[in-house]
Curated annotation (Swiss-Prot):
Residues 332-352, 392-425, 469-511, 542-569, 587-641, 658-734 are annotated as: Disordered. Residues 400-413, 472-493, 556-569, 598-615, 668-682 have a biased composition (Low complexity). The keyword Signal applies. The keyword Signal applies. The gene is sORF2. Residues 1-17 form the signal peptide. Residues 414-425, 542-554, 617-628, 658-667, 686-710 have a biased composition (Polar residues). This is Uncharacterized protein sORF2. Keywords: Signal.
Amino acid sequence: MLWPAALVAMFALAARAREIDNVTCSVVYGSNVARISKDYWLAQEGSLVSFMTFENDDPVYFFMGRALGTGASGGKYLYRVTRDNNTNVSHVQTSLFIPEHFNGGILLDMGSNYTHDAETDPEFLNARYLVVNDTEDSVREETLGPCPEMLRTLDVSGRTTLLYPSRYLHARDRMQVEKTMDTAKCVSTSVNLDATVVFSVDFPFSERAILRVTQTFYPDDRPQKHLLYLASQGGKTVHYSEVSATVTPLPGGNASFNVTIEFTDQPDDTTIHLWVSPKGINDDPDAVSAYYILNSLSSYDDPYAHEEISCDSVYQNIVMVLGSVVNITSPDPLPRAPDYSYPTDDPAGETTESAVTWLEATAQTADEATTPLAAHATDGYEPTTAAATLSTTEDLTQETSTPTVTTVIDPTSGAVTTESRTTEGTAANVATTEAAGTEGQNQEATTAGGPTNAATTLGHQTIEAATVEDSTTTARAAEYPTPTTTTVEPRPAGGTTIEDPTDSPAIEDTTTPTTTAAKVTALKTAAAEGPTPCVTTYTGSDTEAAQSATSISDAVTPEDLTPETTTPVDWSVTSTYISVADGTSMPAPTPSAVAHEASTTPAPTATAVPTSHTPKPQESTSTPSRAPTTGVAPVTANSLSPAATSSERIVILNTATASSGPGASTGATTAPISPPWSASPAGDGVTTSAARTLEPSSTRKAVAAESTTAADDVATSELGSGDYGDHATEPPRIVITNPPGITTLHDADAAEEDPWPTRPLYSVNIVNATLTANGMLTATCMAAAKAKHAITFTWHVGSNMVPAITGPPEPGLMFNGNRAWSSRLQTVEYGISPSARLACMACTVPPAQRYCAHDVAVVARHDRLELDMQVDVATVSVVCSGLDGVESEPYFVWTANGRPVPLGSVRTKRIPNDYGTPARWQSAIHISRFFVPAGHRDVYECTATLASGETIKATKNWSNTDYLALQKNAAARSTFVVAGGITAFAVAELL
């Protein structure tokens, strides 16, 4: 049996320790409602017991405790330790309910006889690889032969892993954290540790309460964490061998006692975290009683300062402590106390706001703008992203080389060529460029390989990949030795031409050196001369509209890493009406123009890639077998959204500027401010969104400007010729972009200093949007926010505000310490328009300062006998729905990755609609996995057979980029590689 490559690679990231020969490795299969149990018999009482799980290459949960004698039975705790009175040995029973998101996770069980030496060298008992499969009716475990080498050379104590503090808290700890914020007592104490200090606090404590003490210190500004003490029973004194700390509970009444922590000769700049739960290990979680921070500063004048603080201010610290009680050696600096204050443009903190009002408020002039876009340098980025970890000037100025990819379309033949050349950049630029590669054209255009690519794919940046000296620059450049040119299938005549501002036929590099060494020398010389603007202009063929989309960015140099001033940037866009009836297109009127403020902080070179377009993973296709699809395929919300949309993108509103191409306008047109969704469809055409996006420059992310064409996004049918002025053979380019937008910016300095996420609202996405033939419009708006924030939603259909009739939004799925909120829209769209334009704005509510983000979508009217497939996050299912008005129950057959899904796993029901519209049919199966390894894709197919014998089929692709669109955080940007996550219906393919 072969182990997945991702699993072996994950273990390669762990620190090496001595080889342990007696490791047992197994694969556990079970459903997410089953429980894993395993017994271990340890040699004597007091043996050390440890437990760790991995998810997405992160330590999800780590527990290190001691056999405490006879333990209470029952409960939901992961471990139960009991005593066999006859043999006088400790019996450890692991008991774990299988969470679905642990699919592909690793459980490491270990224990040892308790001696002073053996405590730091526990015996590795078992490694278990989890496979969550709903078709399993019980838990079964298959023991493997010899374990992989990496498994046998792990540091089993987990104390020296090169992994970041986990963002994936176990449900027990997560619930306690959420309940902490309103009930806990948080205290900060500063002391001078030049001498012995006794630190005493009082807090409620029951006999079976949990007391956890961790220490964080910062050698070379890199935090390391140690578990000092963990007790689950009062009245005992426990010494931990490797640290000079003693925790002594002293009787102090029925409901409380005094904890004394004594430190001697501790390293300077040390933080002690003391976290208390009022209930025992076998009780359901209730609330955190107290959280104490002890800061040791050798230069502190006052020998003792005790201050009660807001728990909100240390929320991330609490999360870090609970999620990483192992020894963590971070490859990059992390802050100790993130600031959770959010600037706002709305001091009153109202809970609702018109989208138009917001857009007017944020359209500042250059003189008024004081908050540069660079404020998003680290917003929402967990430390596993390169942009977050390489946050200091020292890291960002490390020299590396990265390939720049340019795609050129020949205006005559329509042939597409992709040229890759090596340019100078930063380490963060290299890492984030490769991490941002998505399935489709961008991923194909990005040159693969290199140590940074490998590290970023796994969600980690090794020190070797992040720290690149001058001597290694040539070696890294050698990985991309010469420019490569790839010619893809020519497009029909009338393609789009990429031109530079001087009307040159194509972007060419006539000065590229012929050798790698010469290239490196030339690039260093060019970098020393300062940033050079790179302007790529898309030119359409309509003389009157003369619309073009211009992407402007500067090359990044170390001297230009700090945002200073802001200047207005004009963007030009192209919109086209597409006739659903016959597939013809015509240019849309010139869109309204708005000058939006953008930071002058140079962004990485952004090269336009507007040509070959692969259908995005989220696209859902429905093909009735009764007749071939004709005309233009329906444009769905999913097909209009970028494959990996990011709420970090700032919406640059409609701006018409002069273009240097043929038939260009000679001036810019400015119109009153309007939201990107304000234009209503005209006639029988679909108005494409005229919004462009500008990536925040200081995220150091090289962004490929997205562009699609009618042949790509509307289907393979040909467009009509139409009348396009002097260029009748070239239909105008069609831009279809629906990026979400951030409405509130943060202070740039605070963002640069805090690579931990400081944004309460990560993303807003419109999903599952449908418009039936009878006008029933439904959609769901998903917003991912930090768990302590509540969210309100505002819906717009066209330019009208529409309330969500299903009631207030309800919180939903928890992931990565965040909560997914959702609001459902259900209304009737009158008229015969073939599409509807939706907008959803989500805002945090008081007492937190308000923070808003929005998403827009265009949904096409469905034929009544079509099927639409969506992924339902709340139920973790793939849902196939449609067949409006069909009376007899259809027969649904499902396949996952080409393999049939058992009929017992298919759920089919009839969904009645309101407003007198016909009922719909819905069939669903449980999704086999949320996390899909990079380069893989799960394909679900739903086939409905009607009573007449007619069959209708729909397919849905699910990949890591689809999950990225939902999650929007660091782990998502690391392409969500799970250690060989296994599809429920295709286990044999990966094992």
